A protein has these predicted regions:
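Terminal peptide-recognition signature
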Residues: 19, 23, 37-38, 56, ...
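C-terminal long alpha-helix characteristic of the crotonase
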Residues: 24, 132-137, 188-239, 250-255, ...
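Crotonase-fold acyl-CoA enzyme core
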Residues: 100-216, 251
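Short alpha-helical scaffolding segments that buttress acidic/His motifs in well-ordered protein cores
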Residues: 170-171, 221-225, 245, 261
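Structural motif
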Residues: 30, 89, 112-113
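Glycine- (often His-adjacent) and acidic-residue-rich active-site loop
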Residues: 58-101, 117, 147, 232
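Conserved CoA-thioester-binding segment of acyl-CoA-metabolizing enzymes
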Residues: 1-59, 75, 279-291
């Protein structure tokens, strides 16, 4: 184990971090302790230069059944969402706090959906770079059925993946959809047979994406594509790409990347995410006082 937590596990396999929601007796229902644990785990992975990517999955037969409803009709009042109190003039939703932390990860994120993902269990997967799922898994954006609205910045992420009309259909109805349907509409990137070990599949995918690439370049690429794919025109993307190419072009990693190609060998990159990010990153300041 990389570190011990109350509601999750965090371990390393082949330089890949495996984060599992670990309340299987509650179908990994989400609570404030889980929020704190996941946030800390992502901080831990970002700090550790030996870890190249993070996989998010669940223990047991479910990925996450959504918010822990054990408080009954008090579940969604302000006493439940204590993490959201902070210093804003409004109470931030816990799912959004979680999703924004995943979104800001410096390492690639793969969601490996081992079973049903409902409510925040579905929305926390949206900021993952890749989403894979077992064929038996189901997804449900059930918020309207609980008398609330989608959380976790879903109104920003979900339409980017499946389009506005399909997003509205999923959120209006709250219907559970199969992973196969999720794959057809763009929610899921890869379907995995139930007999396969989804963690093994996710690890191989993570290694494929990272083992021959500069970690700093991967971190910057992740933030570039997530940040600038939503710009009104491409000029802002061009400005940032130009700055980053200038910055990375004189780095030791750039020299190694060129020479390893010319010498027909695997690269040995030395730059570290913890030390070698450009001095103008992050290029966008958070709107929230607690960040």
């Amino acid at each position: 184990m990389i570190k011990e937590y109350k509601t999750i596990t965090l371990q390393e396999i082949d330089s890949i971090a495996i984060l599992k929601l670990n309340r299987p007796e509650k179908l990994n229902a989400f609570n404030m302790q889980m929020l704190e644990d996941i946030m800390d785990a992502f901080d831990e992975v970002d700090r550790n230069d030996n870890l190249k990517a993070i996989i998010l999955s669940g223990a047991g037969r479910a990925f996450c059944a959504g918010a822990d409803l054990s408080a009954g009709d008090k579940t969604f009042d302000k006493n439940f969402d204590t993490r959201g109190e902070f210093e804003e003039d409004f109470r931030r939703d816990a799912g959004g706090i979680l999703v924004l932390r995943i979104y800001n990860s410096l390492k690639p994120v793969i969601a490996a959906c081992n079973g049903d993902a409902v409510g925040v269990g579905a929305t926390m997967q949206l900021p993952a770079d890749i989403r894979i799922a077992k064929k038996s898994a189901r997804y449900g954006f059930v918020f309207a059925r609980r008398g609330i609205v989608p959380d976790g910045c879903a109104s920003w992420f979900l339409p980017k993946l499946v389009g506005i009309s399909k997003s509205l259909e999923l959120c209006y109805s709250g219907d559970l959809i199969s992973a196969e349907e999720g794959s057809k509409i763009g929610l899921i990137n890869y379907l995995i047979d139930d007999e396969e070990n989804i963690i093994d599949v996710a690890i191989e995918l993570a290694k494929k994406m990272t083992e021959n690439s500069s970690q700093v370049s991967v971190a910057m690429t992740r933030h570039m594509l997530w940040s600038y794919s939503s710009e009104i025109d491409p000029e802002e993307a061009h400005i940032m790409e130009s700055k980053l190419i200038d910055s990375r072009g004189v780095s030791d990693d750039a020299k190694e990347g060129v020479m390893s190609f010319l010498e027909k060998r695997k690269p040995k990159f030395s730059n570290k995410v913890s030390e070698d990010l450009p001095n103008f990153f992050p290029w966008r300041k958070s709107k929230f006082k607690d960040n």
